Amino acid sequence: MTAFKFWILYFEVTFYFDVFTKEILTCRIAARKGDRQQYIDGLEDVRELLKGHTEPVVLHTDQGSVYASVAYNELIKDTVIVRSMSRAGKPTDNPVNESINGWMKEELYIDFNISECRRKDEFEEVLASYVDFYNNHRPCYALGYDTPVNYRKRYYKGELERKNTFENRVLSEEPKFVQKRRKRAYSKDVSTFEKEDE
């Protein structure tokens, strides 16, 4: 989520972003500080986009209260989405989203004059124009100066090398920090609970 404040307007925008294609999959706007619905609606958009997909898709977020909520995580059940969360207070675990929010904001202010908006519908229109520009017209260095949408199309046509990053991975419901603690306790022949009490 990133916030925009100008004139008397305040908006929070949540972007869902594909790290592989660099495409903005969806974005949702809230006109109230702390509105949780934008996160839920955005995730529902992503679920709709993933209908018919069979390969796992990693959804990485920070540990914000919305992302950790039962309501948010219920939407992921029975989907191909695998959850990943940054460590608490570690924005460096999510550098892609942290940096993209910064330079997208800069482009919106400088190139799209978003600060001239005086109503929510104007803001939504400028944001939609930017997302279209970003996905369909803006060359991306990381994609060999291709656009995100064209890169995705080329990938699905088989023009780009396909890598299965999940091939040798075993997914577990148990968080890694719990696995490490359990392994440490077993290696010392002490139960996890006894170890924590010391």
Each predicted region: which residue ranges?
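An active-site-proximal beta-strand-loop segment
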Residues: 1-25, 33
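Active-site beta-loop-alpha junctions of metal-dependent nucleic acid enzymes
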Residues: 9, 28-52
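Mobile genetic element proteins and their domesticated derivatives, centered on retroelements
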Residues: 16, 22, 43, 59-62, ...
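Short small-residue beta-strand/loop micro-motif enriched in glycine and branched aliphatics
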Residues: 23-27, 83-86, 110-112
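Short, surface-exposed connector motifs at secondary-structure boundaries
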Residues: 23-25, 53-58
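Alpha-helical structural signal in soluble globular domains
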Residues: 46-49, 71, 75-79
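RNase H-like two-metal-ion nuclease catalytic core shared by retroviral integrases
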Residues: 61-63, 69-72, 83-107, 119-122, ...
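C-terminal domain-tail junction helix/linker
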Residues: 77, 81, 105-198
